[in-house]
Amino acid sequence: LAANQIGIEAEKAALDRGVGSQYPAAAGVPELKKEASRFVKAFLNLDISPRACVPTTGSVAGSFGSFIACTQRIPGKDKVLFIDPGFPIQKSQLRIIGVQWEEFDIYAYRGAALHDKLESMLSTGEIAAIVYSNPNNPAWICLEEEELQIIGELATQYDVIVMEDLAYFCMDFRRDMGHPFEPPYPPTVARYTDNYILMLSSSKIFSYAGQRMALACISDKLFDRQFPALAERYKDAGVFGPTLIASILYMITSGCTASTQYAYAEMLRLSTEGKINFVEDTREYARRAERMKKIFTDNGFHIVYDYDATQVVGDGFFFTIGYGNM
């Protein structure tokens, strides 16, 4: 889909104001941080302070930096758990930094069955972070409240950070979501734990992928938590949020493009005010997926991940197909 025109115009205006001559602050421009906090309140009904809403150069950079911080914060707690199917790039990131991971496919562990499987992996004490996308890339399954509660409560119990990738935010088109300050709100693990990092990308909801802009929205409690191991490694205070921003993310991308931050801020602001309906803007993906799936299933293919825990998987950005045993 075409990039959101409001973002384009806001970015042009920022460049015309001269922001291209200035280094952006490592923590992000204040306008974006403010609008990110408002957006999270409007569309998730969560309270995250602006200081804990951190711009990243796409969610790929956000996850890369978060993996580093999560796996270095507690000695011996240094593996990542993927709830698959997932985003292969994230495993490639772990190869770069030499971090090991565990994984399991969610298909056989939907609903209450998730609890024992997840606890068996967290109870080793080695898992530092859990990663998944919701809706899922590539299966388009959506974790439900019961499952997110299990993940959140076990994350608290075993001191694990949940990295929840919300790239396809509000794109479960089976539900009427995306109305600012009105339920229903998308399900999120953030209702069940303070150990979370939410990754919100502009790439899909505003079709702004070319400009590489996202947010890592960190719970305030995690943002302010002090870890002696981080302090020792980075020779700073060891506080999670500031260390992630100044000692890790800045070393990867040296901040985020200033003009694009202003574009994202404006798109978030107008969404929160009800002047951009990004859910309707992206609903075309569901219409296309429905037609494509019918073409495949009419010709002998089947949908591999066909059910969520309690309902048929929806139509959206991705779907998975098989043919016979393939």
What kind of region is each of these model predictions?
Residues 282-326:
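Conserved PLP-binding catalytic core of the aspartate aminotransferase-like
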Residues 1-24, 42, 160, 250-251, ...:
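N-terminal "arm"/small-domain region of PLP-dependent enzymes with the aminotransferase-like
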Residues 82, 131-133, 163-166, 200, ...:
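Short beta-strand segments
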Residues 1, 60, 87-88, 108, ...:
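Short, solvent-exposed loop/turn segments at secondary-structure junctions
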Residues 16-158, 163, 169-192, 197:
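Conserved core of the PLP fold type I
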Residues 9-12, 191-283, 296:
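Conserved core segment of the aminotransferase class I/II
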Residues 14, 32-36, 62, 151, ...:
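Alpha-helical packing segments of well-folded alpha/beta enzyme cores
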Residues 1-2, 122-125, 232-237, 319-326:
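Short, intrinsically disordered, charge-balanced linker/junction segments flanking boundaries
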